[in-house]
Amino acid sequence: MKPILGLVILLSGTVAAQAQATRVYSDAGNIVIERGGNSTKLTTSEMDLDPVLSPNGAFAVYTRQGRGRSPRTYEFNQTCPTEPRPDQLRRINVDGSGDQLLLTGRKGEPERQLCDFRSKQFSADGRRLYFLTPAWASSGALHVYDLRAGEEHFLMPAKGLLVLSFCPNKYKDHLVVLSRRNFLLGGSYDWYWLYDPTGKKELGPLGQFNNAEDMIRQARGFWCAEKP
């Protein structure tokens, strides 16, 4: 899932800036919060990765890898492991309290299996959390978790994701999804497509970009530049 890495790094920095210079990160498998130049360890399992800070800066959501301290690399077509333990999606308050389990990884069909919980991104109000999981040979699966209802469901195949939570215009919380499509007479191509926040309505193609960073610059400089 290497195409996602640059996008995750950029978005982590964006969320941190919005939350008054507060940022969360993983260090030696533990979740750490940094505020005002001071760092505090929130977890101590040595198995925790890929945290993302909520829009209001009150809590973080992270992955606890079920394979413990061993190095973890997921490919798109990987079957989600449940031994020795399944991965977990967890939430913890920024003061270290309230560490709780949100989702447990599971095996299943590509659109149903859960693990990794990569490229986590919130909606603007912090209610919905979008993430990617391994699924098919050429694509991951996009899921959404409703933090109020405690419900998760599959949205669509996806190789990359950007939630336009920072948009001040009509595209606020819309989804930019990198999808693989097939040409009519053979072959395939990877383009970005725009969806409504539910992921149920495709609004149209956004085109091809050399990398995720170029796509994000386009989103901030053009798609989300106009005010309501």
Give residue ranges: language-model regions.
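An edge-strand/N-cap motif at the start of beta-rich repeat modules
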Residues: 18-40
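Blade-terminus and WD-like Trp-Asp/Gly-His loop motifs, strongest in beta-propeller folds
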Residues: 18, 51-60, 120-128, 165-174, ...
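A short loop-to-beta-strand structural motif that recurs across blades of beta-propeller domains
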Residues: 30-32, 88-90, 141-143, 191-193
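Short, conserved, GDST-rich strand-edge loop motifs in beta-rich repeat architectures
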Residues: 23, 65-85, 134, 179-187
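Sec-dependent N-terminal signal peptides
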Residues: 4-13
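N-terminal, post-signal-peptide region of Sec/Tat-exported proteins
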Residues: 37-72
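Multi-bladed beta-propeller domains
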Residues: 34-47, 91-116, 145-164, 196-219
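Residue position within the beta-strands of beta-propeller blades
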Residues: 25-26, 59-63, 129-132, 175-179
